[in-house]
Amino acid sequence: MGLDIVLFRADKGGNPDLIRQSQKVRYANVDAVQEVIDLDKVVKETKYRLDNTNAEYAKLNKSVAMKKKAGESADEIIAQAEELNQSIIKLKAEVSEVELLLRKKLRPIGNIVHESVPIDNNEDNNQIIKTWGECKTSEGLLHHHELLEMIDGYDPERGTLVSGHRCYFLKGIGVLLNQAIINFALMHMTKRGSVPLQTPFFMNKDVMAKTAQLEQFDDELYKVTGDNEEKYLIATSEQPISAFHQDEWIEEKDLPKKYVGYSTCFRKEAGSHGRDTWGIFRVHQFEKIEQFCITEPEKSWDMMEEMINNSEQFYQELGIPYRVVNIVSGALNNAASKKYDLEGWFPGYNQYRELVSCSNCTDYQSRDLEIRCGMKKQGQQQKKYVHMLNSTLAATTRVICCILENYQTEGGITVPVPLRPYLGKDFIPFVKAAPKQKAIPKQKTTTPEQK
């Protein structure tokens, strides 16, 4: 992943100041921009020396051939050519070394932040752009992990014994509810023209490196080894889908490409603590339905609005109150030029919590993956790369948590209407007592603005 190196070259029509400003609003290393510029010059100078040495070497070889043809000794020229050949070997190694260093310096520099992103380094200041639904509020509403236990929908103790911390067995109605959400989510997107993809669960290291940030390898991704191969379990189906068209030219007439990915996801979730670790809200393994779109560069921003709208409609149909926020510049991951989060209302917590993340990564990923937009036309100076966007539709364990809290009653869980055909019932009764015998009081409702 990374920016176009041409953007760093002011003499070639680039705009280094734009990158510096973007790094500044990301609260990232601005000096890294100059480091890339300086290294780029070293690469060009080293390649220039290599080209000149290759040209001299070719001339000497030609002279050797002429000497031999004339029956004359070419020993002196051959010795000179051998010296040049050794220089060429060293210069090639030097070029490889500085190019590798340049790529390492280039990779941590984030995508250009879109002008509509709020400038701040505190996510408490994310810009609220929309709210929907009525938020239930009441003292004593149960949390999702308590409700999941009361419907006998999971077994965290045995999961921990078998697989470790934050692992679990879904069981009984928990399995069926999980599958109902998957089926409803897939149908929701196929009706909107998306092609379903069930992805591989692991990726080759070199391919993963083109679509994941370096820090993800340590903090998020599980490594799998076998047969002398390094692979990584996926953290989201966005990762394999982004590489689905790698090294391809996609004609404009075949764009946009809309996919809905279905996969199990695996995350270390290093550093997570507190209430995030309760129940199945933030776990090491879960299913997720993901939107992924590929567009012409000029059309990606319209597509971003379409994608977040798809997610909004999904949660509206489920009757989940939510808000959409425009994420502040300092909280953007490197690939995202802009990101929306859709946060669902969790009445047990009396707060909004993230359900959806929708990002426009522009051409930041497609460059490394070499996914180009149309064949290069005559007179066109540079290759044109597609823009790539991703958006959660449903991380099923989180959706289960949100449904349980919003649809809890004194006797059980009311099933949201869209899930009833897939689940075969409209109510899930409690079969276990509330933990600590906590009672569920009568509920009242309020609008998000009244919270």
From Swiss-Prot:
It is found in: Cytoplasm. One of its GO terms (biological process) is seryl-tRNA aminoacylation. One of its GO terms (molecular function) is serine-tRNA ligase activity. Pathway: Aminoacyl-tRNA biosynthesis; selenocysteinyl-tRNA(Sec) biosynthesis; L-seryl-tRNA(Sec) from L-serine and tRNA(Sec): step 1/1. Pfam families: Seryl_tRNA_N, tRNA-synt_2b. L-serine binds at residues 236-238, 290, 392. InterPro entries: aa-tRNA-synt_IIb, aa-tRNA-synth_II, aa-tRNA-synth_II/BPL/LPL, Ser-tRNA-ligase_type_1, Ser-tRNA-synth_1_N, SerRS_1_N_sf, SerRS_core, tRNA-bd_arm. CDD domains: SerRS_core. Its EC number is 6.1.1.11. ATP binds at residues 267-269, 283, 354-357. Homodimer. The tRNA molecule binds across the dimer. NCBIfam families: serS. Belongs to the class-II aminoacyl-tRNA synthetase family. Type-1 seryl-tRNA synthetase subfamily. Catalyzes the attachment of serine to tRNA(Ser). Is also able to aminoacylate tRNA(Sec) with serine, to form the misacylated tRNA L-seryl-tRNA(Sec), which will be further converted into selenocysteinyl-tRNA(Sec). This is Serine--tRNA ligase, cytoplasmic. It comes from Dictyostelium discoideum (Social amoeba). The gene is serS.
